[in-house]
Amino acid sequence: MGKYAISYDIGTTGVKTCIFELGDTIKLVSAASEGYNLYVFPDGGAEQEPQEWWDAMCSTTRKVLDKCDVDVNDICGISFCSQMQGLVLVDKDGKHVRRAFSYMDQRATEELKKGIAYGPQIAGAN
């Protein structure tokens, strides 16, 4: 009976899920990936649907567990890495209220320029 960790790489184009056996060395036991949509708009918008992230995580979790004989009770760790600088707006219950803004979204370039030019001035930073 070994010890295992499950890891999730939640990227821009999809999620990659792996189960690793932990010991003197770390051994890949099972892996699966699944893509999801990136909605790109003519005005520079780039958005993603958070529910698609969750659905892909659930699906790949089932796939990696189905492909190996690891007992879920032997999974002693979980690891996440993900895309950065996205924005998910949520309500008071933590539910997303719209698609997430991707870090690739370019719709606020004018606001960014104004913020840098007229926002708080930090010595040496701007």
What is the predicted role of each segment?
Residues A5, I10-P50, K95-Y103:
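Short glycine-rich, Thr/Ser-proximal phosphate-binding strand/loop in the N-terminal lobe
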Residues P42-G45, S59-N126:
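Glycine-rich phosphate-binding/catalytic subdomain of phosphoryl-transfer
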Residues W53:
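Nucleotide-sugar donor-binding/catalytic module of glycosyltransferases
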